[in-house]
Structures are given as C-alpha cells and as structure tokens.
Amino acid sequence: MPTMKQLIRNTRQPIRNVTKSPALQGCPQRRGTCTRVYTITPKKPNSALRKVARVRLTSGFEITAYIPGIGHNLQEHSVVLVRGGRVKDLPGVRYHIVRGTLDAVGVKDRQQGRSKYGAKKPK
C-alpha cells in the first residue's frame, strides 16, 4: 500500500489494454501487398506446411498473414485484404488474409462454410 505522500508524488496509472492486432490500428481490415509467399511448419505436436504471406500494409506495417483454405493464387505483388485472428500453432502469425476479395480468389469447390472462404454457391 502506498502512503499518501507517495500517491501525491506520482498518481496511480490506469492499466492500458494491449491490442492483439496492432498493425490494423483499430480498423476491422487493412489492405496490403504481398512481399513474399511461402510455407512454414507449425510447432509441436502438429506437422504440416502452412501457407503464409509476408504483407506490407497501407498502415506501413510489415506482417505475416495466414492464407486459409485449400489452394491459393497469391504471389508477390498480389493485393490482399487482411483481418485479425491468430493461428494457434504458428508463432508470430496474428493475421488472416480474407479470401474472395481483391487478388485473393475464393476456395474452389467449397460446399460448407463458404462465406469464410469467399466461395460462391454452387449451381
């Protein structure tokens, strides 16, 4: 417990809440350009080749974003929309690329959960 004198000298500081996606700067999504598209391996106990892209955002940040779904058409200089949301088994990946917008096409032949992957309703 601080004394009255200590509280007069320096007041109590409010607890600042830390954002989980600082590069978005409070926006729901941000546009960016892919600088590198590559695969990385997840941490233990999982095993795979997860597709990720290094993206330079309009806010000036350079981030690593996950490419969801099976198959993609992204390459260097592709313009993508990025949303928040981490990938639990990929350390440092705190963003997702939105499929079906800008240069990222939707997942082909997707039947369920189509809205999350930018897939149109099959005829």
Swiss-Prot record:
Keyword field: Chloroplast, Plastid, Ribonucleoprotein, Ribosomal protein, RNA-binding, rRNA-binding
Compartments, record wording: Plastid, Chloroplast
Origin: domain of life: Eukaryota
PROSITE patterns reported for this sequence: RIBOSOMAL_S12
Gene3D superfamilies membership: Nucleic acid-binding proteins
Gene Ontology CC terms, in alphabetical order: chloroplast; small ribosomal subunit
Main location: plastid
Listed GO biological process terms: translation
A single MF term (Gene Ontology): structural constituent of ribosome
Family, similarity comment: Belongs to the universal ribosomal protein uS12 family.
Quaternary data: Part of the 30S ribosomal subunit.
NCBIfam families for the chain: rpsL_bact
UniProt function note: With S4 and S5 plays an important role in translational accuracy. Located at the interface of the 30S and 50S subunits.
Protein name: Small ribosomal subunit protein uS12cz/uS12cy
